[in-house]
Amino acid sequence: MYKKQVMNKNKIIIVFSWILGAMLFGCSDSDANENNNSGDKGFTYSDVITAYDSFNEYLFQDSRQVYRRDAGSGTSEIAVGWTQAMMFDMTINAYKLTGDKKYMDLMERHFEGCSNEFTFDWYDYSHWDLYDDMMWWVGSLARAYLLTKDDKYLKISEDGFYRVWNGKPQSEGGHPLDKGSFDPNSGGMYWDWKFGRTGKMACINYPTIIAAMELYKATNNSEYLEKAKTVYKWASENLFNPVTG
């Protein structure tokens, strides 16, 4: 119910960012160098960037340096934390596609704004109260490190991955059920603790796989690779439908 309410509240920005993010993600550097056409979808890379620039014009809140909940909202109505991670990822993709410094600058500004709004103190329940919300950011920040080699992104990403995987000890004020997202007994990743560790959905398992692989690329630490394989195996057996794909 909680997740559904959040989705409804942010549906405009989320739906558009999913579409635009998928378009940007599908534009690899090598493809962009070969031509300016994205294939049989009927749009060019130039169209994608035009759409992205319009997205930023209407939804990026300059004074707070974060994204609005929707185009009609003022400075007090900003998109929730996990959707900000999606927008952060889009900026990385825009920079990789174009090499335009303005997107690198936007990424830095957005990071600063989100640092002010959400703190990136992963143990602060007032900002971070669901595992998947954190893991979306973990993967995005790992990608930012791979792009910039700026250690600030890697540290926050690694700290976030550790926190999600291991939980917050009760001795440090942790919730009794905040034992970490990973289930060492049955496998898979829980998306929550505050609602009673009620589900192991795609929204936490697959972002965990992606984040672990990005961190493996960033650090060459085989523990991330093994964690990615472990979660992928569980997700393939429990979440993937081989009939429908």
Predicted regions and their residues:
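Bacterial N-terminal signal peptides that target proteins for export
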Residues: 4-16
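Sec-dependent N-terminal signal peptides of Gram-positive bacterial secreted proteins and lipoproteins
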Residues: 19-21
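C-terminal motif of bacterial Sec signal peptides marking the signal peptidase cleavage site
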Residues: 23-26
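Glycan-recognition and catalytic cores of secretory/periplasmic carbohydrate-active enzymes
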Residues: 29-245
